[in-house]
Curated annotation (Swiss-Prot):
Subcellular localization, as worded in the UniProt entry: Cytoplasm, Nucleoid
Keyword Repeat: yes
MF annotations from Gene Ontology: DNA-binding transcription factor activity; transcription cis-regulatory region binding
UniProt record similarity statement: Belongs to the MraZ family.
Protein encoded by which gene: mraZ
Protein name: Transcriptional regulator MraZ
One Pfam family per UniProt: MraZ
InterPro entries, A to Z: MraZ, MraZ_C, MraZ_dom, MraZ_N, MraZ_sf, SpoVT-AbrB_dom, SpoVT-AbrB_sf
Classification via CDD domains: MraZ_C, MraZ_N
Main location: cytoplasm
Source domain of life: Bacteria
Organism: Coxiella burnetii (strain RSA 493 / Nine Mile phase I)
Annotated GO biological process: negative regulation of DNA-templated transcription initiation
Amino acid sequence: MFRGLNPIAVDAKGRIAIPARYREPIESEADGILVVTIDTEERCLLIYTHPQWEQIEQKLENLPSYHPASRRIQRLLIGHATEVELDRSGRILIPPVLREYAGLGSMVMLVGQGKKFELWGKSQWETAREDWLAEELPKGDDLPPELRSLSL
C-alpha cells in the first residue's frame, strides 16, 4: 500500500526519484514497471504498478465503445498511459506531455493513495489541499452511505 506525502525534486531531464520505501514493493510486484496517466478530474497524474494498471485497463476496455463518455475516458486514460521503469537510482522519467498536462515544475508532491500514487505540482497540491480543507463537509444524512459508518 502506498501512503504518505512526499515532496520530490524534478531533475533537468524530467525524472523523479521514487522514495526508497516504495521501491522494493514496486520491484517485487511489478518488476520496477509503473504506468503513468492523467487524472481526468484534477490536473495531476496517476501512477500505478503495471499489474494494477492492467486491471484498470481491462475494465476501461470493457466499457461500451458506442457511449461517448466511455470513449472519452478510454481515449484520455489509455491514450495517455505510459509505461516507465525504475532506473538503477530508483528514478522514473515523466514524459513531457504528461508533465505539461499536470503543470509540473521543479518540485512535485507524490501522494500515496493506497494502490496508486498521485503526482501533483507542489503549488497545485498546496492550493488544492487548502481548498479541500476549507470546504464545508456534508453532515449526517447528506453523507454518502459509505462514509456514514467511517470512524476515524
